[in-house]
Amino acid sequence: MTYAVKEIFYTLQGEGANAGRPAVFCRFAGCNLWSGREEDRAQAVCRFCDTDFVGTDGENGGKFKDADALVATIAGLWPAGEAHRFVVCTGGEPMLQLDQPLVDALHAAGFGIAIETNGSLPVLESIDWICVSPKADAPLVVTKGNELKVVIPQDNQRLADYAKLDFEYFLVQPMDGPSRDLNTKLAIDWCKRHPQWRLSMQTHKYLNIP
């Protein structure tokens, strides 16, 4: 299949359980919860998204004719001769495009694969690290994985229900924006009252990591 990718870049993972880990980020274009266009935000299921996933005009972005072509670009960004290859498939919603041929090609190239998904679409069991960031008004079909990362606050959100799911790590992350300081306090207070949960911060924004 042809893969539409917004951007591909090498950096450090800034948030979640893998914060600080070097990774190639492959941001797929498109999402099933929002068109990505500002004029549609009020009608979106996810109205707080802070990511540009529209089109294929970002760094190293484009339309890739097959899995091998996409993997070649991803692999070309990893430091030459270095092991511990790791790619984060994100979006948008990566499960609109991430398929078994691409997973197989990435594994063949020596990459561990993480996915950042909203959890409303089934994921492939062959993915190495599953991070689900559920949206309160969207269906949640992925109920087990490695990491559940919940952005707070959201309307109609019930964190206590998420705690019953089958994940290794449970994280709350304060929503960015003008209320970030208040949201951070809410997240800290939640973790202190419910020790099953950990705090996730978007460290790349605080440290200006590109």
From Swiss-Prot:
Residues annotated as transmembrane: none
Alphabetized UniProt keyword annotations: 4Fe-4S, Iron, Iron-sulfur, Lyase, Magnesium, Metal-binding, Queuosine biosynthesis, S-adenosyl-L-methionine
PROSITE patterns noted in UniProt: RADICAL_SAM (PS51918)
Names of the cofactor(s): [4Fe-4S] cluster; S-adenosyl-L-methionine; Mg(2+)
Residues that bind S-adenosyl-L-methionine: F48, C49, D50, G92, S133, P134, K135, Q173, P174, M175, D176
GO biological process: queuosine biosynthetic process
Positions with a binding annotation for [4Fe-4S] cluster: C31, C46, C49
4Fe-4S found in the keyword field: yes
Pathway linked to the protein: Purine metabolism; 7-cyano-7-deazaguanine biosynthesis
Radical SAM core domain ranges (all copies): 18-210
UniProt cofactor note: Binds 1 [4Fe-4S] cluster. The cluster is coordinated with 3 cysteines and an exchangeable S-adenosyl-L-methionine.
InterPro entries, sorted: 7-CO-7-deazaguanine_synth-like, Aldolase_TIM, QueE_Cx14CxxC, rSAM
UniProt-annotated binding residues for substrate: L12, Q13, G14, R27, T90, P210
This protein's name: 7-carboxy-7-deazaguanine synthase
Taxonomic path: Bacteria, Pseudomonadati, Pseudomonadota, Betaproteobacteria, Burkholderiales
